[in-house]
Amino acid sequence: MNIILLGPPGAGKGTQASKLVADRGMVQLSTGDMLRAAVKAGTPIGLKAKAVMEAGELVSDEIVSGLIGEKLDSMAASEGAIFDGYPRTEAQAHSLDEILASRGRVLDHVIELEVDEDALVERITGRYTCANCGEGYHDRFKQPKVAGVCDVCGSAEFKRRPDDNEETVRTRMAEYRAKTAPILPVYEARGLVRRVDGMADMADVSAAIAAILDN
């Protein structure tokens, strides 16, 4: 089972991918993480990517495709892949088909976590964490049981991410739409796209994804 998981920042894509990794033994292929790991490990593709990045240039499709291929080659045939952040262009979508086919794999589903932009803004701008233990809270959905005191460690210090503001969230939504717009029609034409309500309860989102994969 090989899937592409799509969703704007804050839609819970990372949470759902982690659950698929834990529950089904799938492997998450996040191009950003893979790029950093390849550079750190000094693999041939990593060295090539490092030279490109140090020159201030964008990493080419060829390098990204090489990373994907390298990762798939290290996986057991029984392990499914979750593609995160790739493909982003029609050319990359076709390249992924070739990469999978050459390894006896196919793309089974493209799952998009749909969100309401205004509700997503509220979800993201209201979140904060304990500065000591990292426990997560929300202005509306999850307040500490005792105001100003962390439920887990008792700390009175909390912090918010500086980019959890409305302007940044809306900019990211626009960027997400611009990046996914080219590839969704490609997969819709092939009947691969399934949409899930990303604003639902986390467990309900997980159940909806599981139903798609088990169908």
Swiss-Prot record:
Keywords: ATP-binding, Cytoplasm, Kinase, Metal-binding, Nucleotide biosynthesis, Nucleotide-binding, Transferase, Zinc. Zn(2+) binds at residues 130, 133, 150, 153. Its EC number is 2.7.4.3. Its main location: cytoplasm. The keyword Calcium does not apply. It holds the Pfam family ADK_lid. GO terms for molecular function: adenylate kinase activity; ATP binding; zinc ion binding. SUPFAM superfamilies: Microbial and mitochondrial ADK, insert 'zinc finger' domain (SSF57774), P-loop containing nucleoside triphosphate hydrolases (SSF52540). One of its GO terms (biological process) is AMP salvage. GO terms for cellular component: cytoplasm. It catalyses: AMP + ATP = 2 ADP. Pathway: Purine metabolism; AMP biosynthesis via salvage pathway; AMP from ADP: step 1/1. Coiled coil: none annotated. InterPro entries: Adenyl_kin_sub, Adenylat/UMP-CMP_kin, Adenylat_kinase_CS, Adenylate_kinase_lid-dom, ADK_active_lid_dom_sf, P-loop_NTPase. Consists of three domains, a large central CORE domain and two small peripheral domains, NMPbind and LID, which undergo movements during catalysis. The LID domain closes over the site of phosphoryl transfer upon ATP binding. Assembling and dissambling the active center during each catalytic cycle provides an effective means to prevent ATP hydrolysis. Some bacteria have evolved a zinc-coordinating structure that stabilizes the LID domain. NCBIfam families: adk (TIGR01351), PRK00279.1-2 (NF001380), PRK00279.1-3 (NF001381), PRK14527.1 (NF011100), PRK14532.1 (NF011105). Belongs to the adenylate kinase family. PANTHER family: NUCLEOTIDE KINASE. Monomer. Catalyzes the reversible transfer of the terminal phosphate group between ATP and AMP. Plays an important role in cellular energy homeostasis and in adenine nucleotide metabolism. This is Adenylate kinase. It comes from Rhizorhabdus wittichii (strain DSM 6014 / CCUG 31198 / JCM 15750 / NBRC 105917 / EY 4224 / RW1).
